[in-house]
Amino acid sequence: MSKEVLTKSKEKMDKAEQALTRQLGTIRAGRANASLLDRLSVDYYGAPTPVNQMASISVPEARMLLITPYDKTVLGEIEKAILKSDLGLTPNNDGSVLRLSIPQLTEERRKELVKEVKKEAEEAKVAVRNIRREANEELKKLEKNGDITEDDLRSYGEDVQKLTDESIKNIDNITKDKEAEILEV
């Protein structure tokens, strides 16, 4: 039973790390990346639809995204959504595809993005700490019910702390890599 608590906690912490990686992938780092448009939705027949489900997104060059909608009638809607978004990009519409040129980031914009990365990382760390708290509470319940001894509680508590430390270290590494990518000129 207590091993299950550790296994579940490890899985949840891994998911928190993966969620952070996905979230950081949507932050522009001066290079073209199709995941930049992951959070972008377009009103399509009355329903908000993610752009990546309405169009093929490719990266023909290091600083260029090419958006080819499956239905050409939504080209204008996708263009409007990009202009309204906080991406700071201006699409070039040639009637059948949209080209997004990714400009060099200014020093000021880089610093803003690093702050955003740190905020996302802190949220991931809070999630991991909450998972640790839940695991410790579950272990205390097991000890109270007599399923594990006090020594087992202490031992498993240390294991949960090791998992937490490892997960936070991974989050720090993910964050450091993304910051380096953003600050790279």
Swiss-Prot record:
* Single biological process term from Gene Ontology: translational termination
Q: Where found, per UniProt?
A: Cytoplasm
Q: Name one GO cellular component term.
A: cytoplasm
CDD domains, alphabetized:
RRF (cd00520)
The answer, when asked if Nuclease is one of the entry's keywords, is no
Protein keywords: Cytoplasm, Protein biosynthesis
MF terms in GO = ribosomal large subunit binding
Which Pfam families does the entry mention?
A: RRF (PF01765)
Report the function annotation for this chain. Answer: Responsible for the release of ribosomes from messenger RNA at the termination of protein biosynthesis. May increase the efficiency of translation by recycling ribosomes from one round of translation to another.
The record's NCBIfam families line, in alphabetical order, gives: frr
The entry's family comment says: Belongs to the RRF family.
The protein here is known as Ribosome-recycling factor
What organism does the record attribute this protein to? Listeria welshimeri serovar 6b (strain ATCC 35897 / DSM 20650 / CCUG 15529 / CIP 8149 / NCTC 11857 / SLCC 5334 / V8)
